[in-house]
Design a protein with these regions (language model features):
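ABC family nucleotide-binding domain
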Residues: 3-209, 213-216
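Short, low-complexity, intrinsically disordered N-terminal peptides in bacterial proteins
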Residues: 1-2, 226-227
Length: 227
């Protein structure tokens, strides 16, 4: 079942002779319980595409559909609610708040939803167990390894039980063994929870395990098996 779709997506920055076309005419479909990988060289438009799909940016042309909602037509408040409640993000640089513990970082999306304390505690404990960090719940990011920090990032992305998981180079700063653990975790969540997952990556192992692969070059699709 299609959960997230991009139809004819284009993104242009600037205007006139200095305009840069970062993305042009891209179609993509992300399905429940399946992993879609976006690959391509640096500067090919991978991050731009993920930003559009995740509602972090608006397309210059085309549409992004999350279920029946057209993200690019939502108000800022509606778009913020969709990002908060329906989409989880995993970033290459982890994006953790240094002064908060692992558990507190994971809890942030639930606080934004004004969820009751008891329910927040249950959700946080559940996802920390899922990523194998229960014993490290009280530690701050600076006390954790890179792999542990990325697992906190994954837990934070999952704690609100999103329909869509978007990950931009989630293994880019990790050693091969740790990267494989993160890949296994992302795949487990995709399969067991039925999450629609889209990942931008150069990692050949993760690419080989994808259900669908979309290859970008200079902002355009040059190959893919997204039929």
């Amino acid at each position: 079942m299609s959960v997230l779709r991009g139809v004819g997506l284009g993104r242009r920055y600037g205007s006139g002779q200095t305009a840069v076309e970062a993305l042009a005419g891209v179609d993509v479909e992300v399905r429940a319980g399946r992993l879609t990988v976006v690959r391509g060289p640096s500067g090919s438009g991978k991050t731009t595409l993920l930003n559009l799909l995740g509602g972090l940016d608006r397309p210059t042309s085309g549409r992004v559909l999350l279920g029946d909602d057209v993200l690019s037509e939502l108000s800022e408040a509606e778009l913020a609610a969709a990002r908060r409640d329906r989409i989880g993000y995993v970033f290459q640089n982890f994006g953790l708040i240094p002064v908060l513990s692992a558990a507190e970082n994971v809890e942030v999306p639930l606080r934004l939803r004004r969820m009751e304390r008891g329910q927040r505690d249950e959700r946080v404990a559940e996802v920390l167990e899922l990523v194998g960090l229960t014993r490290h719940a009280g530690q701050r990011p600076g006390e954790l390894s890179g792999g542990q920090q990325q697992r906190v990032g994954v837990a934070r992305a999952l704690v609100a039980r999103p329909e869509v998981l978007i990950a931009d180079e989630p293994t880019g700063q990790l050693d091969s063994e740790t990267a494989e653990r993160i890949m296994d975790l992302i795949l487990e969540v995709t399969r067991i929870r039925g999450t629609a997952t889209v990942v931008a990556t150069h990692d050949p192992l993760l690419i080989s395990r994808a259900d669908e692969v979309l290859e970008l070059r200079d902002g355009r699709v040059v190959a893919g098996n997204l039929a």
